[in-house]
Amino acid sequence: MKKILILVLMVLFLLPGCSSVQKMSPEQQFKKSFSKNIYETFTETPIKGVYEIYNGQQIYYYLSEGDVLFVGNMISKDGKNLTQESNAKRMTSKLADLSLDNALKIGSGETAIVEFIDPNCHYCRLSFNFFNTRKKDVTLYVLFYPLSEDSANKIRHIFCSKDKAQAYDDVLGGKLDENAQLNLCSDKAAEDLMKAHQQISAKVGIRATPLFYIKGQVVPGFDQPAIEKLLAE
């Protein structure tokens, strides 16, 4: 009788439904292994066992079987950058509700364009030349994302200037390169704008420049054909 009782208890212990140890979900496993990693979303990808993690600024991936994290671009067989597409969708939702009160407004055209730029960025200056001839057609809402100390100083010069639009033209046009004298005031309003742009960039998840938001779509980089197509719609 005692042997039968022991056998029954062993069977009950081995049955999946009776086990006291429940198998963790991939997300629970991730939380346990990478407890310091803060994230907004944890979603499945087209690859079995690989999950997309978005931390508000960057997409990375979790391989549940190996319990490892990795960063990179996921490319489909037809050449689509699935990582870039997913990131653009997330940025789009944030940009759709973005307040532009602190953006530098340039132009007076019907089409509104939000742009994140660094004043020394080569492609940002190419986009400046492109939009500079279209000021009657578009209104730019400029948000700065400095990638160097010199860029930050040039942004401060713009914010410290009485005519910010002209200062923007001078800086992006290259007139203040070659160690030109900059207006680096300690004005609180300028400092507040510097902080506001920094906070907005962090909220949206900006990590490189330029980036544009045109007619509900995100355009990473100065993709002139894509921009021209959107403007023509």
PLM region spans:
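Catalytic cores of secreted/periplasmic lytic hydrolases that degrade extracellular macromolecules
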Residues: 163-181
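Mechanochemical coupling/switch segment within NTP-driven translocation systems
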Residues: 158-162
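Extracytoplasmic thiol/disulfide redox context detector
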Residues: 5-7, 18-156, 170, 181-209, ...
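Hydrophobic core
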Residues: 9-14
